């Protein structure tokens, strides 16, 4: 399966629902969103372990508010870095491996062309991404080291995670075992619990946006669709296979869409394919809003029960959106063996191999081999792009990017 498209815009879709809602119709716009093969964590909050996660979230909200209301700007410049190679390209920019001249550290530099960002109507998403990245701080989320702009481009400098995307490892080995899927899912649950406590919706969960480091832990990357929302929002964005039914039906939605996406991700990790797929997006949407899910025979009863409660079309029954919030997910029997604090503190090693699984491909997926901080072997796309580029002599579209 090729890397999937993100979509942003409106959607042409028509569906009758059991509750008598009228059909919804609009137009669809599809675009590639530049992947961010990178990851960064500012100060390690594991240096001061927290036994009470709720206590941590209270403190995290205070720290986030301070950074959100006082966003950092122009914390470096292009001349501070040696540009080594292009790691990937997208419709309005590219990601480059760079080396910070003063520290010698390697980073992934996300470079966005201002004119292309404007042409593709991604100004708001780009400004949101930068503001969110400079304000968040959590072990399983990509954070930003530096950001700056010049006459032509916007720059976000992120720690380079050389283990590569979960997507490529999952496609290579087929599927993950339930213990391995649970190990990864637990990190996503904690990350979403953190984001949602800050009124942030992620909206773009998929294996392509999950990086695996050399210790086997995840980093969620690409916050281009993330948004701070206290109530509901109506923007159509995401990846077709991962869209919640309320997004497709243009009903307005809240943080519950992330928990639906978690269900899709867990299913895809454990099965090797998503629960809703077809040749055309419209066919995918029809399957999603139908609410019908077929499970592989090897899924445990506990896993099937969890997925039935996450892939729940009825928002009044979907786990994560009920009175107990995320506790319904964390206390589910499929997560019965999960030590949530130990996961947060990164004290848990990936589950041991079961008989028949101990092969090179699986080991490489769980513990990606890297030879040094600049190893790019897990970024399989060979991109022939020059490391030098022309910067405009005069400011372009400056008024649109004042907040960057």
UniProtKB/Swiss-Prot annotation:
Post-translational modification: Isoform h and isoform j are myristoylated.
GO biological process, one term: signal transduction
Active-site residues per Swiss-Prot or TrEMBL entry: 204 (proton acceptor)
Mutagenesis or variant effect for residue 234 to R: Loss of interaction with kin-2 resulting in constitutive activation
Gene3D superfamilies found in the cross-reference section: Phosphorylase Kinase, domain 1, Transferase(Phosphotransferase) domain 1
GO MF assignments: ATP binding; cAMP-dependent protein kinase activity; protein serine kinase activity; protein serine/threonine kinase activity
Modified residues (Phosphothreonine): 233, 376
Summary of the knockout phenotype: RNAi-mediated knockdown of isoforms a and b in neurons shows a temperature-sensitive adult onset paralysis of the distal part of the body resulting in the loss of backward movements and an inability to lay eggs. RNAi-mediated knockdown of isoforms f and k results in no obvious phenotype.
Cellular component, GO, one term: nucleus
Binding annotation for ATP: 87-95, 110
EC number(s) reported in the record: 2.7.11.11
PROSITE patterns: PROTEIN_KINASE_ATP, PROTEIN_KINASE_DOM, PROTEIN_KINASE_ST
Summary of activators and inhibitors of this protein: Binding of cAMP to kin-2 regulatory subunits induces dissociation of the heterotetramer. The released catalytic subunits are active and able to phosphorylate their substrates.
InterPro entries (alphabetical): Kinase-like_dom_sf (IPR011009), Prot_kinase_dom (IPR000719), Protein_kinase_ATP_BS (IPR017441), Ser/Thr_kinase_AS (IPR008271), STKc_PKA (IPR044109)
Function: Essential for larval development. Controls the rhythmic contraction of enteric muscles probably by regulating G-protein coupled receptor aex-2-mediated calcium influx in GABAergic DVB neurons. Plays a role in the control of oocyte meiotic maturation by gonadal sheath cells.
Name the UniProt record assigns to this protein: cAMP-dependent protein kinase catalytic subunit
Species annotation: Caenorhabditis elegans
Gene symbol of the encoding locus: kin-1
